[in-house]
């Protein structure tokens, strides 16, 4: 492709609203442009990268036995109502009405549509297992779109769905697609980890996220320093044991703590370590208010609270709800004196506290010498806190460290969550009606492009891995007015294309500095500069990833490039 014919508008300055490298560089290099908040156009170079990621995804999905189809982006509300998610999915689901006031959703995901499709066509175990996938635009009404393609309102996604007669069949396909995902992200050149995850609004049980390691990732990964264990911090269980001291219990005492609300303030004011304080929080679990206790140096994990109750929605109670429930402000909460009708659950660590402190449910006062079970009753002790760095790894090997990650893929064992809700059944080999067993497998295709750009860049621009680069080689005649340089550049361009390489020829009448700056921004793997030594049959070859350059004779160029790109 000749650069003079390409629509690739570059920017010299960093756009003001672009916070992270991938967003900045994809805009500056002319790979995309913003249409509205969280909505982007892919320009020609960006689209070439997107298509290369799509190709890798298709190859690995088909190798794993999945078959491609295409479902509608606009989905009837009745299907979502049938599954129950019309009411539970939340405000991220984009809803609309047609001229006849019939309700629809713009697809954030396609479980309902695919289940409806398959239940009408697959009636026998003889047609199972079946794995179908699509690559299609999805829509989510993000409250705060940010980070360019990493959190948008419109994005390209590959979603696959598998249907099975037995759990063993689901396990087999799940493992196969897990490996396919690992292959996809490895082929894209990414540094990633597969981690144990929460299924969230999707439902189901076993699930893994594929996380690209990056400091700008919105998720925290907890991983072992000596084993392969890795989990989203929300899902990492705490296996610590707590020993109760033999300190004698003291008499409960209420003390004034004026203007001291946070644990750090209270512990400093009372000269008590944070790990002897009891942090009390009120959560709304579906429609029920529950008091949750953790140790003062720990944080409540709301996903674990949700899983304790098998709830659909868990959120912090509002100040007004806390006031109505306990007649106190949030900063004075404590478990002592709470009405017996209100359930109190606590993390395991709370049970070992001796002579601790807690809020007194009265503004400006706390209790000291607090002892669980003597001073208040707990209905259940369980794992309710976030794991911390330095904790024992849940697999028993090593200690936990943290890293940030960008989620680019997610695989779920949905089980019968959707098939039972939507009456999607089949006849088994005994002629009995059974619900279809399902799996679900998603990849953020456009997000993967951003994740690659986030991992592969330097101070000068993008540095694309060969497998996804828009072109393999960038040929730059420095002076297009020079017949020797122009002709040699075109000859190299043509010969490399004949060898199967994708080549970009900078045939613009621009200054050398402009050409080189754009070349660094674009980040193609190999740059061939045709300069003053063209008359001698010599060009300069530069490897973008390493910055290494070498003068090469034209007759040796193809072999030299082949060694770089092998």
From Swiss-Prot:
Its main location: cytoplasm. Gene3D superfamilies: Anticodon-binding domain, Bira Bifunctional Protein, Domain 2. Keywords: Aminoacyl-tRNA synthetase, ATP-binding, Cytoplasm, Ligase, Nucleotide-binding, Protein biosynthesis. It is an enzyme of class 6 (ligase). It comes from the Bacteria. One of its GO terms (cellular component) is cytosol. CDD domains: ProRS-INS, ProRS_anticodon_short, ProRS_core_prok. The keyword ATP-binding applies. The keyword Hydrolase does not apply. Coiled coil: none annotated. It catalyses: tRNA(Pro) + L-proline + ATP = L-prolyl-tRNA(Pro) + AMP + diphosphate. One of its GO terms (biological process) is prolyl-tRNA aminoacylation. It is found in: Cytoplasm. SUPFAM superfamilies: Class II aaRS ABD-related (SSF52954), Class II aaRS and biotin synthetases (SSF55681), YbaK/ProRS associated domain (SSF55826). Its EC number is 6.1.1.15. Pfam families: HGTP_anticodon, tRNA-synt_2b, tRNA_edit. One of its GO terms (molecular function) is proline-tRNA ligase activity. Belongs to the class-II aminoacyl-tRNA synthetase family. ProS type 1 subfamily. HAMAP family: Pro_tRNA_synth_type1 (MF_01569). Homodimer. PANTHER family: MITOCHONDRIAL RIBOSOME PROTEIN L39/PROLYL-TRNA LIGASE FAMILY MEMBER (PTHR42753), PROLINE--TRNA LIGASE (PTHR42753:SF2). NCBIfam families: PRK09194.1, proS_fam_II. Consists of three domains: the N-terminal catalytic domain, the editing domain and the C-terminal anticodon-binding domain. Catalyzes the attachment of proline to tRNA(Pro) in a two-step reaction: proline is first activated by ATP to form Pro-AMP and then transferred to the acceptor end of tRNA(Pro). As ProRS can inadvertently accommodate and process non-cognate amino acids such as alanine and cysteine, to avoid such errors it has two additional distinct editing activities against alanine. One activity is designated as 'pretransfer' editing and involves the tRNA(Pro)-independent hydrolysis of activated Ala-AMP. This is Proline--tRNA ligase 1. It comes from Bacillus anthracis. The lineage of its organism: Bacteria, Bacillati, Bacillota, Bacilli, Bacillales. The gene is proS1.
């Amino acid at each position: 492709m000749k650069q003079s014919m390409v629509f690739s508008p570059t920017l010299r300055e960093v756009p003001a609203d672009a916070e992270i490298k991938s967003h900045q560089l994809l805009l500056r290099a002319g790979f995309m442009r913003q249409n509205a908040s969280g909505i982007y156009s892919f320009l020609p170079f960006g689209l070439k990268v997107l298509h290369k990621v799509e190709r890798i995804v298709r190859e690995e999905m088909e190798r794993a036995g999945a078959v491609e189809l295409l479902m509608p982006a606009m989905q009837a509300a009745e299907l979502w109502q049938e599954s129950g998610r019309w009411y539970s999915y939340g405000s991220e689901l984009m809803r609309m009405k047609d001229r006849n006031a019939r309700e629809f959703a713009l697809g954030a995901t396609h479980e309902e549509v695919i289940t409806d499709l398959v239940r009408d066509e697959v009636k026998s175990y003889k047609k199972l297992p079946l794995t179908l996938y699509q690559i299609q635009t999805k829509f989510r009404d993000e409250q705060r779109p940010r980070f360019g393609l990493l959190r948008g309102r419109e994005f390209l996604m590959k979603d696959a769905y598998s249907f099975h007669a037995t759990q063993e069949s689901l396990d087999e396909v799940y493992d196969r697609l897990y490996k396919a995902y690992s292959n996809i992200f490895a082929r894209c050149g990414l540094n990633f980890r597969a981690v144990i995850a929460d299924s969230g609004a999707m439902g189901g049980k076993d699930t893994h996220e594929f996380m690209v390691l990056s400091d700008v990732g919105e998720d925290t990964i907890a991983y072992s320093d000596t084993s392969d264990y890795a989990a989203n911090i929300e899902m990492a269980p705490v296996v610590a044991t707590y020993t109760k001291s033999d300190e004698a219990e003291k008499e409960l005492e209420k003390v004034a703590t004026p203007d001291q609300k946070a644990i750090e303030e209270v512990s400093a004011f009372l000269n008590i370590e944070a790990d002897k304080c009891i942090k009390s929080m009120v959560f709304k679990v579906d429609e029920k208010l529950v008091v949750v206790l953790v140790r003062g140096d720990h944080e409540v994990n709301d996903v674990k609270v949700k899983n304790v109750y098998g709830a659909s929605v868990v959120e912090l109670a509002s100040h007004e709800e806390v006031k109505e429930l306990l007649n106190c402000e949030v900063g004075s909460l404590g478990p002592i004196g709470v009405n017996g009708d209100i359930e109190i659950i606590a993390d395991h660590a709370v049970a070992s506290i001796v002579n601790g402190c807690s809020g007194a449910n009265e503004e400006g006062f706390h209790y000291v010498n607090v002892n669980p079970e003597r001073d208040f009753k707990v209905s259940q002790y369980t794992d309710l806190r976030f794991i911390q760095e330095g904790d024992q790894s849940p697999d028993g090997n090593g200690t936990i460290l943290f890293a940030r990650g960008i989620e680019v893929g997610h695989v779920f064992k949905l089980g019968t969550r959707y098939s039972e809700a939507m009456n999607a059944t089949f006849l088994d080999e005994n002629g009995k009606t059974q619900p279809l067993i399902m799996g679900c497998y998603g990849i953020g295709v456009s997000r993967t492009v951003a994740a690659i750009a986030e991992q592969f860049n330097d101070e000068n621009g993008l540095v694309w891995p060969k497998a996804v680069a828009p072109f393999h080689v960038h040929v730059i005649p420095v002076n297009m007015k020079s017949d020797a340089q122009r002709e040699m550049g075109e000859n190299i361009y043509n010969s490399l294309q004949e060898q199967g390489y994708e080549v970009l020829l900078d045939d613009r009448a621009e200054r050398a500095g402009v050409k080189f700056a754009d070349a660094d921004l674009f980040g193609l793997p190999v740059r061939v500069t045709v300069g003053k030594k063209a008359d001698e049959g010599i060009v300069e070859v530069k490897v973008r990833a390493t910055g290494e350059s070498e003068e090469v004779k034209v007759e040796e160029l193809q072999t030299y490039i082949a060694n770089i790109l092998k």
